[in-house]
Amino acid sequence: MTLSSTQHELEPAPPPMFAPSNFLNLDQTEHRTIFDNSAQVWDVLKQIGSYLQFRLKPAVYARVMGRPFISEHVYIGEGTVVENGATIKGPAWIGSNCEIRSGCYIRENVIVGDGVVLGNSCEFKNCIIFNDAEIPHFSYVGDSVLGYQAHLGAGVILSNFRLDHKEVSVKTETTPIATGLRKFGAIVGDRAEIGCNAVISPGSIIGRNSLIYPLTHFGGVLPENSILKLRQETHRVERH
């Protein structure tokens, strides 16, 4: 049976609101298959440990400066520089042409793309970082995903644990969405920028190309191509 000229094939359904492809260019990670079973973008956080357990083949091709600590459960690609004073506990998979600066602490279950900067006094745990992202100074990234060319200013904290120890939910404009996760920091979309000393609450979703002003506290869902501005007042008085 042939279609008449007035009939059309059905368009494919758009991906769900929180599908990984709505926030992340999956071509900008060597590990795109880890997202295959993730209906919601945060589902991938449950997969990192098992993915590394079965796929990681430890090897260090990096240029190692001085005597950083690198455990036996680590892969590091060519052209990456690991500076003296860095700690890579692992399991960790680090791509090529990265900078792992002095004082960086890479804990368990970390996947890092190519051309990434992981800086001084930054801590990473159970996270995926896409190609060309930069986290250069004094940040915490736990149970989170950072997209292609995402950037965190100095002192940005992606908080991953609620004060009341309850399950983390994603707060939408209508109703919270249960994640099934007790620890979940943030999804930071491709080319998103977060300014210095911002604090991002657990379960936050930041869309592609969005910008958050320094010193902001944010929780919830920030749509793509947004600017989240902080307005504060200061008052000068005479000192006596």
List PLM regions with ranges.
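Glycine-rich hexapeptide-repeat left-handed beta-helix
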Residues: 31-35, 120, 126-240
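Long amphipathic N-terminal alpha/beta scaffold segment
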Residues: 47-93
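N-terminal short leaders/motifs
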Residues: 19-38, 71-73, 79, 85, ...
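Residue-level "contact hotspot" at macromolecular interaction interfaces
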Residues: 73-75, 93, 111, 145, ...
